[in-house]
């Protein structure tokens, strides 16, 4: 009998994807196959090639010819004999029972189906694994839907907020420039998530072990850069606000370019190093695996930024406590505590303080809870930041009302702008009264006014 024809080229991709889904919640399988699993799949490819070459060299027999069934090479066998082989080695990674065998019988009609059943059942992956696979599929689809909604809302809100801060010149100042860069980092992060999902899940590049395409790797590199840049711009927000409160006098223009370097330059440095190292040492798959020592090139700077921002957050809350403390100790006044609570809640999304909850836990600790918190809750952070620091900002609302009154008057009364009375100040007055002109007052008054501009909702 003739040997079976080779399986389609994408069969190994399907095998890798199925094995990844079957293992469900354990951390490594949630994102892709590790190097050990990839080694097994590579071994299967080698065995497949060797089996087909040997089958072509063998003479025709009256029994069953050598056959490759996508996992095991069955030797040429006379009719009437049963061949018993051990389960493929790859099943030992996730089957609790070891030492299981599979068999086929050579008959006049050829090889019989696999006994005692298909590989998943015969080698220890039974209904429990299938049920787990189905549950995890539902869970991951729900998570993907959740963060897709969150990033979509954030993207829409951030685009509008960035346009507002960019178009109205009276809102141009260092503080709002930093806000705009933070908004842009959130926009890039949301966009990169959609591109990565398109490259990894909505395309045929599901094999995490073969050499991925340049486009797929580029999508992952872009995603990692945007995520790191977003964390570093959260750090810049913390550094800027802390500097306003702690430093008597400083050049905002000089510091601003330093903030630009921290927000965009530092992440690009780490990502370039990570990219070069992966090309030389782990250039397999689509670079979406995170369970190797190389992942710390990205993870360590992000953890450091989260920790520093949390420390800055605690220090700023301490300054708030001092500033909002009632002057009369004997007087009972709940207003300062209410303002402190509002200020704290206002700063949490700006500093990304919520990330500290799971930042220093192992990746496989409460993996599903961590995934929901970081992916779904984190996806709405950009929307919350845009609402708090643009749409609910007093300066923005005042400028929008002023523009609306002018447009309304021009539309209803036909007024021309050249006949309008000049505004009370030049472009940028709104921000200059909040930040730039603070250099003309005492350090304590300057720090107080600047901070009040940040927490104008309180």
Curated annotation (Swiss-Prot):
Alphabetical keyword list: Cell membrane, Disulfide bond, G-protein coupled receptor, Glycoprotein, Membrane, Receptor, Signal, Transducer, Transmembrane, Transmembrane helix
Pfam families noted in UniProt: 7tm_2, HRM
Domain of life: Eukaryota
Annotated signal sequence range: 1-31
GO cellular component, one term: plasma membrane
Transmembrane portions of the chain: 143-167, 176-197, 218-242, 256-277, 293-317, 340-360, 369-392
Subcellular location: Cell membrane
Residues modified by glycosylation: 59, 70, 101, 105
Cytoplasmic side: 168-175, 243-255, 318-339, 393-458
Disulfide bonds, paired cysteine numbers: 38-209, 51-73, 64-106, 87-123, 216-286
Membrane topology: Multi-pass membrane protein
Extracellular domain ranges by topology: 32-142, 198-217, 278-292, 361-368
Annotated GO biological process: adenylate cyclase-activating G protein-coupled receptor signaling pathway; adenylate cyclase-modulating G protein-coupled receptor signaling pathway; cell surface receptor signaling pathway
Subunit structure and binding partners: Interacts with ADCYAP1/PACAP; activated by both PACAP27 and PACAP38 neuropeptides. Interacts with VIP; the interaction results in VIPR1 activation.
Free-text function comment from the UniProt entry: G protein-coupled receptor activated by the neuropeptides vasoactive intestinal peptide (VIP) and pituitary adenylate cyclase-activating polypeptide (ADCYAP1/PACAP). Binds VIP and both PACAP27 and PACAP38 bioactive peptides with the following order of ligand affinity VIP = PACAP27 > PACAP38. Ligand binding causes a conformation change that triggers signaling via guanine nucleotide-binding proteins (G proteins) and modulates the activity of downstream effectors. Activates cAMP-dependent pathway.
Family label: Belongs to the G-protein coupled receptor 2 family.
Protein name as annotated: Vasoactive intestinal polypeptide receptor 1
Originating gene: VIPR1
